A protein has these predicted regions:
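Nucleotide-activated donor-binding/catalytic signature segment of Leloir-type glycosyltransferases, i.e.
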Residues: 139-163
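Conserved donor-binding/catalytic core segment of Leloir-type glycosyltransferases
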Residues: 44, 85-104, 110-113, 127
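Donor nucleotide-sugar binding/catalytic pocket of nucleotide-sugar-dependent glycosyltransferases
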Residues: 37-78
Length: 271
């Protein structure tokens, strides 16, 4: 039997303005996905959003939904001490992790952060963790935007070691996601694991992954988002409530639980 595990393909039109090569690859990916529709016997999609993608591509076989298997023990490794010390300095840290790419909409994160910094907390920092490979023009445009609007402390880490990623998470006070295309969005789960309050724009699979954890935004309004950031960061009771909801959602992604379900699906449909 032929089995497919599907993680999604970024719509090429989202990448086209900044990375034509990546857009072409994604376009080819969609064509190949359609060609495989009648070649596989069973599919696992890591979100309902991804399942619907397969159905749109013409897949008639059985498709089950199972979240990504995440090795949470990796996140308990020691963070990079110098970087943690650098960012754990009393400055409020807003974080987003994910490759620098136009579908991730880091420009909207910077916009909301800039208003938060201007109107609520000048002692704040934005840490954008992720490699910009292929999207250097997009990164440069965002850097110019921050400079023109006098937004201070916007950090593009570039590609960094895993221990340094852990340090960024450990130092973070709030996770802000404005991405417009995610097949699952592992960083949401990572932020929940590190007990960082999450605000995320409700696009693609984002709402599905976040569940009842975190705060979902149904529209992009930078000023309202900045006010919400301030409210969450100042209200310890609200923070505790959000983190409690996130912890509850996190249980659904427990490694043993997902692994057991994966093996069960294979036994039922493949073996």
């Amino acid at each position: 039997k032929k089995v497919m595990i599907y993680h999604n393909i970024t719509p090429p039109e989202m990448l086209e303005p900044y990375n034509k090569a990546a857009a072409a690859d994604c376009r080819e990916g969609y064509e190949e996905l359609a060609k495989l529709a009648d070649k596989v016997d069973y599919c696992i999609a890591d979100s309902e959003y991804n399942k619907q993608d397969l159905i749109k591509a013409g897949y008639k076989c059985k498709i089950d939904v199972l979240p990504i298997l995440i090795a949470f023990s990796d996140y308990d490794k020691k963070p990079d001490a110098p970087l943690y010390g650098k960012y754990n300095d009393g400055v409020t840290n807003i974080i987003f992790t994910g490759r620098i790419a136009s579908n991730k909409c880091q420009q909207d994160v910077i916009h909301a952060f800039g208003l938060y910094q201007k109107y609520y907390n000048s002692n704040s920092r934005l840490i954008l963790v992720g490699n910009e490979g292929g999207y250097e023009t997009y990164k440069l445009k965002m850097q110019k935007y921050a400079q023109l609007n006098c937004i201070k402390n916007v950090i593009f880490t570039g590609h960094i070691r895993f221990a340094e990623i852990l340090a960024c998470y450990k130092a973070a006070d709030l996770f802000l996601c404005m991405s417009e295309h995610e097949g699952f969005c592992v960083p949401l789960v990572e932020a929940m694991y590190f007990k960082i309050p999450v605000i995320a724009y409700n696009s693609s699979a984002v709402g599905e992954t976040l569940g009842k954890g975190g705060i979902l935004l149904n529209e992009k309004n930078a000023l309202e988002t900045a006010a919400l950031m301030d409210k969450i960061l100042k209200d310890k009771g609200l923070q505790k409530k959000i983190i409690a909801n996130q912890n509850e959602r996190l249980d659904d992604f427990a490694h043993d639980k997902i692994l057991a379900r994966f093996n069960e699906l294979l036994r039922e449909n493949v073996l």
